[in-house]
């Protein structure tokens, strides 16, 4: 992981000229994203200040191609700034403590000033600057990207297939309410919100038990969408194919069934696709961290659940 970042920086320095590299770091909750980014920034800022013994495998530091590294203002002022100072203080406290969990997207920018041997003149050295934009975002949002290829029925079927064992136990309260709901009836916003809250409580219980394949990811880390109707829907696990087709043919646009479909489509096309277009598709490189020990400490099902999430 760190080796691949080093290799990328080395290649840019060898090519010369100024350039920007957009690096995203993500992972599921408590995988160490914030601590990793804080450490990476700290290591780069101390190049040429500590004899570079702290980065023995980083060729650009070892051969002193990197002249200096400093933090500079980010270009996109609408994205929250990664709080490097506060996170570093957490790690350096006595005793140390873990950094605050990632709740949304944040960014920081480093300017890496370097020089390299010119390919034209033996004693002439070229200088340039690599701007390293580092993004931190919740891995739970990454797990939503497969929804772009699934309609509401397909997603509901996928969720039905994984709702077993511990998940089935946690889902019971929500499923009881779902089975009593007349999907063809005119929607009541309050009832819909209550059942959606039960579904969210189910997802949070799964997360607390070490499950990591959580969809929709914004339900457990809503960010600026907390309380919005777009986060008030849920899969229909109990319907047969025949029931799906009948509801599609016969229900009106103001029915529970139609509104659930509409909200899922809005979430997929606006929230998930918006994240993909505005952030994910713009990253040059991505580091994904995974905490394998926590699921193992919980149960075999939690570990399998993590594998399912990583394979999406």
Where are the regions a protein language model picked out?
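Short coil/loop residues immediately preceding or within conserved phosphate-binding loops
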Residues: 20
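Post-Walker A alpha-helix
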Residues: 36-37
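Switch- and interface-adjacent substructures of P-loop NTPase systems
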Residues: 5-9, 17, 43-312
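Hydrophobic anchor at the beta1->P-loop junction of P-loop NTPases
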Residues: 23-25
């Amino acid at each position: 992981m760190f080796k691949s970042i080093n290799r990328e920086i080395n290649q840019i320095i060898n090519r010369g000229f100024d350039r920007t590299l957009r690096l995203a770091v993500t992972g599921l909750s408590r995988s160490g994203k914030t601590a990793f980014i804080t450490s990476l920034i700290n290591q780069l800022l101390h190049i040429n200040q500590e004899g570079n013994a702290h980065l023995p495998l980083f060729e650009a530091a070892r051969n002193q191609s990197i002249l200096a590294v400093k933090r500079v203002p980010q270009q996109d002022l609408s994205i929250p700034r990664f709080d490097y100072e506060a996170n570093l203080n957490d790690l350096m406290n006595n005793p140390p403590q873990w950094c605050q969990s990632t709740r949304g997207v944040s960014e920081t920018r480093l300017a890496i000033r370097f020089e390299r041997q010119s390919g034209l003149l033996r004693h002439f050295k070229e200088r340039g600057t690599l701007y390293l934009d580092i993004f931190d975002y919740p891995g739970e949002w990454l797990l939503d990207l497969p929804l772009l290829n699934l309609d509401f029925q397909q997603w509901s079927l996928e969720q039905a297939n994984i709702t077993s064992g511990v998940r089935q136990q946690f889902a019971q309260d929500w499923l009881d309410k779902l089975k009593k709901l007349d999907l063809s009836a005119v929607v009541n916003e309050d009832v819909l919100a209550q059942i959606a809250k039960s579904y969210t409580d189910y997802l949070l219980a799964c997360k607390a038990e070490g499950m990591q394949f959580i969809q929709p990811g914004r339900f457990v880390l809503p960010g600026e969408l907390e309380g919005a109707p777009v986060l008030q829907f849920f899969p229909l696990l109990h319907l047969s194919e025949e029931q799906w087709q009948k509801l599609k043919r016969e229900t009106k646009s103001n029915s529970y069934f139609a509104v659930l479909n509409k909200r899922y489509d809005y979430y997929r096309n606006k929230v998930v696709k918006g994240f993909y277009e505005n952030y994910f598709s713009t990253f040059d490189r991505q580091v994904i961290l995974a905490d394998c020990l926590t699921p193992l400490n919980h149960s075999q099902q939690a570990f399998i659940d993590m594998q399912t999430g990583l394979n999406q």
